[in-house]
């Protein structure tokens, strides 16, 4: 595996690959790799000639410096996983390489509306950090494909919008959420959960599933009442809720009577650990 930390070396490598007409796939990560990342890499391998994984803990997308400091750093372990999966290139720059003028002086990318609602309200500035680093990676790596998980569903829609409106010649491929046996979605933050907390965390997906089943069985009626019941259930189980609501899965607008494509999006806290999850439903006409 070719480990590249320097932008100039990366650009040289990309020029070589482009000359050979190689199809490039990018899997952007912040490290602390788990089964969800591995599934993305395997999906990439089916679609491209060269898989490039980036590892960069992006300070611009953290509104809480303590959260940034606590984010798990497992570089050696990550390298072993990537070598095992036969990834061709790892791009792992440091902060100075990506933001040489510092965060405050750096140009940023802001996707209007979509980045200001739901998670964007709870974490102002977060999506600006995400879209800025994704644009930088797209510009540097020039992938034909880029691969993202559906757990960060709002992020996925924002990136798709960015690609379309900035005319990037990149196809975004998404992977459904990978879960533990108890239903908990794979996340780098799960390592902070004790065994008992991991069991407790599974109540989140249970609540989401129950809500989806209710909406399907009632063909979209009394959704607000059911959302309220699910919120109460989670609070009773010890969760603090930032977000637990139903949205149009194509636009993330609030649902209306005519909504057929619905997604339940949840962002909750279990102690000091933040968990996010979602599930889509399609209602019949």
UniProtKB/Swiss-Prot annotation:
It is found in: Cytoplasm. Its EC number is 6.3.2.1. One of its GO terms (biological process) is pantothenate biosynthetic process. (R)-pantoate binds at residues 61, 155. The reaction proceeds by a bi uni uni bi ping pong mechanism. Homodimer. NCBIfam families: panC. This is Pantothenate synthetase. It comes from Buchnera aphidicola subsp. Schizaphis graminum (strain Sg). The gene is panC.
